């Protein structure tokens, strides 16, 4: 792989990441789970910030634009949901949706970590040490997000996706991510 191909693939993956987090934010907003919604709004902003930094790095260090890759819509939201209103979602549907959403998030972050680690290795193999170090920062960031997503998944499994547990953490998560977004916006 060339440096250009590596950055092109990373950029496309980040665009898809923004799409996934935006769709998960709508997914949870529709389910009236505002803590989870706020979580994915935050991660969408982070993903966009990392993508901008990636583009800026490539332009400033390689003096080129990153070529675009076709990006497939991740279709996180089931098409059947578009026929319903929020108040028509029953408890079992909500529980199953939370389970599916968390599993998608963990799978996405796992895939992302693998891609970033491979990009790091490939850049080192090409002798692009500085670029590899830039990507190493992304590996560490996604590793932290994956740890958080996996812990959330384990907690929900332990609680057997109890609707009481799910609803009980929404206010805390909403406020916590609201504060994180305020801090994020200052930088």
Regions found by a protein language model. Name each.
Residues 1-187:
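Iron-associated oxidoreductase/ferritin-like identity signal
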């Amino acid at each position: 792989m060339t440096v250009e191909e590596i950055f092109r693939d990373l950029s496309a993956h980040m665009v898809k990441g923004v799409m996934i987090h935006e769709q998960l934010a709508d997914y949870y907003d529709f389910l009236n789970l505002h803590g989870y919604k706020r979580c994915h709004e935050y991660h969408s902003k982070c993903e966009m910030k990392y993508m901008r930094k990636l583009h800026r790095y490539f332009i400033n260090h390689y003096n080129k634009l990153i070529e675009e890759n076709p990006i497939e819509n991740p279709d996180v939201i089931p098409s059947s949901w578009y026929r319903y209103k929020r108040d028509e979602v029953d408890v079992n549907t909500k529980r199953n949706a939370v389970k599916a959403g968390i599993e998608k998030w963990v799978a996405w972050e796992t895939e992302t970590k693998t891609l970033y680690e491979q990009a790091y290795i490939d850049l080192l193999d090409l002798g692009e040490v500085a670029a590899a170090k830039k990507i190493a920062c992304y590996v560490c960031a996604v590793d932290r997000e994956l740890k958080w997503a996996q812990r959330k998944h384990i907690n929900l499994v332990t609680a057997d996706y109890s609707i009481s547990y799910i609803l009980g953490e929404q206010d805390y998560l909403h406020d916590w991510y609201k504060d994180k977004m305020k801090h994020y916006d200052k930088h």
